Amino acid sequence: MQSTSQQFDVIVVGGGHAGTEAALVAARMGARTLLLTHNIETLGQMSCNPAIGGIGKSHLVKEIDALGGIMALAADQAGIHFRTLNARKGPAVRATRAQADRVLYKAAIHHALENQPHLWLFQQGVDDLIIQNNRAAGVVTQMGLAFYAPTVILTVGTFLGGKIHIGMNHYRGGRAGDPPALALAERLREMPFRVERLKTGTPPRIDGRTINYSQLIEQPSDQPLPLMSYWSHGEDRPRQVSCFITQTNEKTHDIIRNGLKTSPLFSGVIEGVGPRYCPSIEDKIVRFADRNSHQLFLEPEGLNTPEVYPNGVSTSLSFDVQLDFIHSIKGLEKCHITRPGYAIEYDYFDPRDLKPSLETKYVPGLYFAGQINGTTGYEEAAAQGLIAGINAALQIQERAPWTPARDEAYIGVLIDDLTTRGTNEPYRMFTSRAEYRLLLRQDNADLRLTEKGRDLGCVDDERWNFFVKKKETIEKEQQRLKKQRIWPKSTVAKAIESRFQQLLERDYSAMDLLRRPEINYPALMQIEELGPAVLEPSVAEQIDIQAKYEGYLTHQLAEIARQKKYQTAQIPSSLDYNQVTGLSNEVRQKLNETKPTTLGQASRIPGITPAAISLLLVHLKKKELYP
């Protein structure tokens, strides 16, 4: 083993979406950070679908953005197709999705990494961890080079013990074209972590020049184009292109059913559990046998490549079956497959072995983030990487760790779900996982988190000044609207009654009127006496939403305040649950497995009853551990 002379504060292993966010935020907070990757050219690579956001996922992206992260900005700089999902539904469940040019996206990530002070890149795979005095102290690369740091973040994606399946052909790999991390996987299996296998997959890629687009339904970008980042201005967007929609048919399904003998999933070769919410096409055909078609979205991979991503047909069937079923789909009868679809199995570690900071419970200074914790998706990985990077930097600064609570961010929901409940299948974020959806909207992530990000040191001056100006503009306009009185039978009242068919029987403020569902801010401001309107769309949106949902938001905040005291009550890590009178053996076992840090976390462990929480509370009070 050769030692290097450089000493770092934080070492990040892996350069995917978790690793890049972890490295960037640690360096932004002033930590000397080393990012190790087996190939610098693949930093920030979109290994599967070239898209960012979606239902539940764009909430994570915007929270990352609010805390100074790079993902949303890169999506805006590389986005070639943008849509607002659930646009006709309430603001709590609206989402933004950006189809990205994968080359432009990777270039945006590269540029951020290469221009970040306090961050160094080095191309080497990692084979071993250095543990000194029972805590992380560094890593050893494949050529025996030792790098030292008191904190190490593993963001290794699907590379740990990775095994690729195409039909009955199987070979070791971290993803197509990349080697697996076998030595590191073996090293981690020697440590006291609970380890299992998961599986994910990807569809074949298609040459767009061989697609018959005249047979397909075109889906253009929304206009005006939605922005992913709060700090984007929209001037430098790439050229926008359309996606296209087609669907499978009975012939497709027959080909797949007849080809199941070539499926490693259905022949028992694959042991890992696949993603429930992104199943392979063969899994869909078997599970939903009554369906005679499934929708496909044909999504361009970039502006300067003919390759197309057929979203909806992830598969590990043999290549000849892939070719046959693709050719049975309308518009794809003569298409050329450029890359086969495949499944990949990999190691993941039970996230209940992590603290909410994402530091491992058994090895201080060692953090896990991304698919190693059982999640699926770029956005979920990036969110974990950000929190791991923040907490590694805070540890170096000898400051307390920080993770947002469930009532503060979807990131908090994600990490609490993982560290409290664990997962036995790839975990994906949905808005339905959050109890306080109306508070945790994608439109207000900056208002929820940017001040905290500034306190932590991960939001730079430019973003902070932009945020302060926006917040002041919102507050100033709200005060103006509250002071504007509209009297019955006045000229303004008559204009409002005529425009909105709303009878004004008493005096109202302009803010009162915005609480009515029939009236919105831009339309109200078209009445000359009530203007001028604020022109910034994001400010106008906040004024509208905050006015209309004020009552609901006040109720949710009051509910959170009522629960806060007991939810945040600390449980000492040394607590012996055998000494808590009245707990069943099952409850004791679950508490010992998870080792919750607060009563709130304990209450969310599956199988822990309200009665058990009451017994815990009595015990803590008896031991004078609860005020």
UniProtKB/Swiss-Prot annotation:
A cellular-component GO term for this protein: cytosol
Binding site for FAD: 14-19
Binding-site residues, NAD(+): 274-288
PROSITE patterns: GIDA_1, GIDA_2
Cofactor: FAD
One GO process term, biological-process aspect: tRNA wobble uridine modification
Pfam families documented for this protein: GIDA, GIDA_C_1st, SAM_GIDA_C
InterPro entries in the record: FAD/NAD-bd_sf (IPR036188), GIDA_C_N (IPR049312), MnmG (IPR004416), MnmG-rel (IPR002218), MnmG-rel_CS (IPR020595), MnmG_C (IPR026904), MnmG_C_subdom (IPR047001), MnmG_C_subdom_sf (IPR044920)
One GO MF term: flavin adenine dinucleotide binding
Subcellular location: Cytoplasm
Keyword set, alphabetical order: Cytoplasm, FAD, Flavoprotein, NAD, tRNA processing
Subunit structure of this chain's protein: Homodimer. Heterotetramer of two MnmE and two MnmG subunits.
Function: NAD-binding protein involved in the addition of a carboxymethylaminomethyl (cmnm) group at the wobble position (U34) of certain tRNAs, forming tRNA-cmnm(5)s(2)U34.
HAMAP family per the UniProt record, alphabetical: MnmG_GidA
Family, per entry: Belongs to the MnmG family.
Protein name (record): tRNA uridine 5-carboxymethylaminomethyl modification enzyme MnmG
Organism this protein belongs to: Coxiella burnetii (strain RSA 493 / Nine Mile phase I)
This protein's encoding gene: mnmG
